């Protein structure tokens, strides 16, 4: 095969790959699929991408290499036909509060440039545009007036300020000026009446009197320059023969006119300055619109748009609690009598008892406790059992006291404690727009840059397409190239189904799928060709409706002349690929081989391919024969949810069932389920400090005793955390080893078998198994510890064996092997078997938590929940649990979730995967669109009911799925 047309891989052995040889066609859309843990990512990311990136970086100078991440050389004999590689992974973009969708996609950078070049500043006082002018422009403006027009050229030296101004007038006389206009009247300087210093005055110096004619330019330029020097960049041309109507002058009662404005006048400014309010803007440059730059950032919030402030709702989390029982949350933990005695003294002054509930207190008493007595003195009696004393002073108030301590303390612990009672509120100075008033006064089409970032991408796209209609010829020419860049980028974000996001949205709040698609849009914007792109499940979090747009985008990337490799489980993606590689046959040690390759039809025809069987319909996730009965009485009811884009939504979730919350991306699913239901329920039932989104109430919580959100956040942030420690299997493993005869003879306790504490661990690497060596031009190298050879424990600890295996050998087993090895030890076996149940039999017992994907971390948490004793009164909430799962894994996961429901629990999932939705007992479909166009309940009921609803996109695709499976299996058979 010619190298040019193929990427040929020989002998790939990274992770679990079994010496894989593979030829992939270049410039095609290639999908790699297979069970979770079968080796897809090992081949796509750890072999192909790593080698492509490593070769590219290696070709750079040593100086350039130090700034780039250098990849380890993968375990492979040879790869030919590679291009420079770009990987677009699942990781959430950035936790930096300054990073927004606009900054990540670079759209905001182009917007800053656009506003700096064609934006017009408006005066906040008059609402009129303010422009900086050169002297030549001022002269041209005057010369353009009708010939013979009589004008006074004035320098406004005092504008609405108190004072006598004797000294200033004397100075002017010395400089040779003769006339001034004071408070609306012209005087010779010598004849100006004494000014009352208690009142505001206006003084304009008469620099020249002119009659407009063509040869006036030189004289006029000199006069205007004199004005600009005298009046700090301002000059006035006043029409001598055009007095204003009396009602429009200051004397006639007009509030926004100065006393000197008696005639029509033209105001010139060589700076961007509003001549009325004195509001000035220095030069208008792109940095003025950057909230990451002191020139543009709002000085109050430093460009963050929010401020941390004590939230009264967190101070009093439960209004039905009595004061003596800890209604005031920051005081509730203290065992000292001080706080109770403080409340008793306040009670005497404001007429309440400490046995009263917060809800029973008068508004005045509540204000006094929260915000202080505002100077009113209270007599406090204190007695702590050792001494008693009395003091009379105003009470500071719980909130001012916490704010003061937060500002003054040096203790990180104290700050953290107080921050538990703080919430983010929009900055009052910039209203959350992050910028200085100067930046927000610059507008295009009556909107400032902050208002545009608040629009959804769909609306912003329409706005930028229409805006050049309001430009003049010069502005249109300047803006053309900038607008092209902005429009293209917005179009790509639209194409990957992110039209509901706003440009101001914080990057840290995006899901993994959203941040990956944003990076994908940025890549298309860069328009590279001849590149190898490797993507990791870009369809995560996308509704079937938007999937077609995403696949178009991937094809567009291919058509530019790139090779696109996608690790994906989505049926449509597999069917649209030019080439499919199915890796398996199973996970972990049982995987790592290429089972089938070729066109989607070849995969379906291959009897060894599990993926092929699901695609052809030979195997499928079964629809339950009958759905669970829906109880009329036992149900949760969310009433009046209004968070984010929800439009006063009320919905029932039947208890003891499997419910799916569906809808297009941005429809309001997470706001409804996580931000409203989970946070409110965990606050009521578990006493958490979560702050739910706005809603009226939640009914039916009395049927629950626990609510658990099983999300995709990491199970631990250090390499020391692993599935065994997280699920609690490691404790019985250590106990078992400590109970062995050899360990007892040596007097070893369970702590001896921990790699986190001194005693049993290898001290050379402190139980890490590797030692980090910093290299400056190369990646940091982790060298296996030469004392313990990566085993983490010292020799004495490793001498203790069970069935010929040490504790280090156990940590190196896969979960499946571990469950078999400990088959006689139920405490260990049961915990490991739950991991096998959720499809994680392939991961190592001691695998570092940092190497688990989001979907794997979520399933480890699910396994931990499964291994707990069932109470049957728990509400489990899962956000897209099928992330990273093959059809076959989805079938297994559904068994687990339905098992939880069989125990009497309630499981609610946010899900786009139709295989999951069709097995649900109850479906709540939100939408119909994303962002502003969503937030309503479109359909609710059993899957069969959803299919009937014309407005439901989910229903349309579900109907198609239920109808097309039988058709396809007959085609595959042919």
Swiss-Prot record:
A zinc finger (C4-type) spans 762-788. Residues 331-610, 630-959 form the ABC transporter domain. One of its GO terms (cellular component) is cytoplasm. This is UvrABC system protein A. ATP binds at residues 34-41, 663-670. Keywords: ATP-binding, Cytoplasm, DNA damage, DNA excision, DNA repair, DNA-binding, Excision nuclease, Metal-binding, Nucleotide-binding, Repeat, SOS response, Zinc, Zinc-finger. GO terms for molecular function: ATP binding; ATP hydrolysis activity; DNA binding; excinuclease ABC activity; zinc ion binding. HAMAP family: UvrA. The gene is uvrA. The UvrABC repair system catalyzes the recognition and processing of DNA lesions. UvrA is an ATPase and a DNA-binding protein. A damage recognition complex composed of 2 UvrA and 2 UvrB subunits scans DNA for abnormalities. When the presence of a lesion has been verified by UvrB, the UvrA molecules dissociate. Belongs to the ABC transporter superfamily. UvrA family. The keyword Lipid biosynthesis does not apply. NCBIfam families: PRK00349.1 (NF001503), uvra (TIGR00630).
């Amino acid at each position: 095969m010619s190298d040019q047309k193929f990427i040929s891989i020989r002998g790939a052995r990274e992770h679990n790959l079994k010496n894989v040889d593979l030829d992939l066609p270049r410039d095609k859309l290639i999908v790699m699929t297979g069970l979770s843990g079968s080796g897809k990512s090992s081949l796509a990311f750890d072999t192909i991408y790593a080698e492509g990136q490593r070769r590219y970086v290696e070709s750079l100078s040593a100086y350039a290499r130090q700034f780039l991440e250098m990849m380890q050389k993968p375990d492979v004999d040879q790869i030919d036909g590679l291009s420079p590689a770009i990987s677009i992974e699942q990781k959430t973009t950035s936790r930096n509060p300054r990073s927004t969708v606009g900054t990540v996609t670079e759209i905001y950078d182009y917007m800053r440039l656009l506003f700096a070049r064609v934006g017009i500043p408006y005066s906040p006082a008059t609402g009129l545009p303010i422009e900086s002018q050169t002297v030549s422009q001022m002269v041209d403006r005057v010369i353009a007036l009708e010939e013979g027009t009589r004008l006074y050229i004035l320098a406004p030296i005092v504008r609405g300020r108190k004072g006598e101004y004797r000294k200033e007038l004397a100075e002017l006389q010395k400089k040779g000026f003769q006339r001034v206009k004071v408070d609306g009247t012209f005087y010779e300087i010598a004849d100006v009446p004494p000014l009352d210093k208690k009142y505001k005055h206006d003084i304009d110096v008469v620099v020249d009197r002119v009659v407009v004619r063509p040869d006036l330019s030189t004289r006029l330029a000199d006069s205007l320059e004199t004005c600009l020097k005298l009046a700090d960049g301002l000059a006035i041309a006043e029409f001598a023969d055009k007095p204003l109507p009396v009602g429009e002058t200051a004397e006639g009662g007009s509030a926004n006119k100065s006393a000197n404005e008696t005639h029509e006048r033209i105001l010139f400014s060589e700076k961007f300055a509003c001549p009325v309010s004195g509001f000035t803007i220095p030069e208008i440059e792109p940095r003025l619109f950057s909230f990451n730059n002191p020139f543009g950032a709002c000085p109050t919030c430093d460009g963050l748009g929010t401020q941390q402030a004590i939230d009264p709702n967190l101070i009093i989390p439960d209004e039905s609690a009595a004061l003596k029982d800890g209604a005031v949350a920051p005081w509730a933990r203290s065992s000292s009598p001080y706080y109770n005695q403080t409340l008793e003294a306040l009670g005497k002054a404001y007429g309440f008892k400490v046995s009263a509930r917060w809800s029973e207190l008068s508004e005045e008493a509540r204000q006094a406790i929260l915000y202080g007595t505002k100077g009113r003195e209270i007599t406090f009696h204190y007695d702590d059992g050792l001494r008693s004393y009395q003091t009379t002073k105003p009470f500071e108030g719980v909130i001012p006291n916490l704010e003061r301590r937060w500002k003054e303390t040096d203790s990180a612990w104290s700050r953290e404690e107080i921050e538990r009672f703080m919430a983010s509120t929009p900055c009052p100075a910039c209203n959350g727009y992050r910028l200085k008033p100067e930046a927000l006064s610059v507008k295009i089409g009556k909107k400032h840059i902050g208002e545009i970032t608040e629009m959804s991408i769909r609306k912003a796209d329409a706005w930028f397409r229409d805006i050049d209609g309001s430009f003049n010829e010069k502005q249109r020419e300047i803006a053309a190239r900038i607008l092209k860049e902005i429009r293209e980028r917005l179009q790509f974000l639209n194409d990957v189904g992110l039209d509901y996001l706003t440009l101001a949205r914080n990057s840290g709040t995006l899901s993994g799928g959203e941040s990956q698609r944003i990076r994908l849009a940025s890549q298309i914007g860069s328009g590279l060709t001849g590149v190898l792109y490797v993507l990791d499940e870009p369809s995560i979090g996308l509704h079937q409706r938007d999937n077609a747009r995403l696949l178009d985008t991937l094809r567009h990337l291919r058509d530019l002349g790139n090779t696109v490799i996608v690790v994906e489980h989505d049926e449509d993606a597999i069917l649209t690929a030019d080439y499919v590689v199915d890796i398996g046959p199973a996970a972990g040690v049982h995987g790592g081989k290429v089972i089938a390759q070729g066109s989607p039809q070849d995969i379906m025809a291959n009897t060894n391919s599990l993926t092929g069987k699901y695609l052809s319909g030979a195997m499928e996730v079964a629809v339950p024969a009958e759905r669970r009965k829906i109880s009329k009485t036992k149900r949760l009811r969310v009433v009046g949810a209004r968070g984010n884009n929800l439009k006063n939504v009320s919905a029932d979730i039947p208890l003891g069932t499997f419910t799916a919350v569906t809808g297009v991306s941005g429809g309001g699913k997470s706001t409804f389920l996580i931000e409203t239901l989970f946070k409110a329920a965990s606050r009521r039932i578990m006493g958490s400090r979560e702050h739910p989104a706005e809603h009226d109430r939640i009914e039916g919580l009395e049927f629950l005793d626990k609510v658990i959100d099983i999300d995709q956040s990491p199970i631990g942030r250090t390499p020391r955390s692993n599935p065994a420690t997280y699920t609690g299997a490691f404790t019985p493993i250590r106990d078992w080893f400590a109970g062995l005869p050899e360990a007892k003879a040596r007097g070893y306790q369970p702590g001896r078998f921990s790699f986190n504490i001194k005693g049993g661990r290898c001290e050379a690497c402190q139980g890490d198994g590797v030692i980090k060596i910093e290299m400056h031009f190369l990646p940091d190298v982790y060298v296996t510890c030469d004392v313990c050879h990566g085993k983490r424990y010292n020799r004495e600890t490793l001498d203790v064996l069970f069935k010929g295996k040490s504790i280090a050998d156990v940590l190196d087993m896969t979960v499946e092997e571990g469950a078999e090895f400990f088959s006689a030890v139920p405490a260990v076996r049961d915990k490991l078997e739950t991991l096998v149940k959720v499809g994680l039999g392939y991961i190592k017992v001691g695998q570092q938590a940092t190497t688990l994907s989001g979907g794997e971390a979520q399933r480890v948490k699910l396994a931990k929940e499964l291994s707990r004793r069932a109470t049957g009164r728990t509400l489990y909430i899962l956000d897209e649990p099928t992330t990273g799962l093959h059809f076959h894994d989805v079938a297994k996961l559904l068994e687990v979730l339905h098992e939880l429901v069989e125990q009497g629990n309630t499981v609610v999932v946010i899900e786009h995967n139709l295989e999951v939705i069709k097995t649900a007992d109850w479906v709540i479909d939100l939408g119909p669109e994303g962002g502003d166009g969503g937030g309503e309940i479109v359909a609710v009921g059993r899957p069969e009911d959803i299919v009937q609803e014309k407005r439901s996109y989910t229903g349309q695709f579900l109907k198609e799925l239920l109808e097309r499976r039988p058709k396809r299996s007959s085609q595959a058979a042919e």
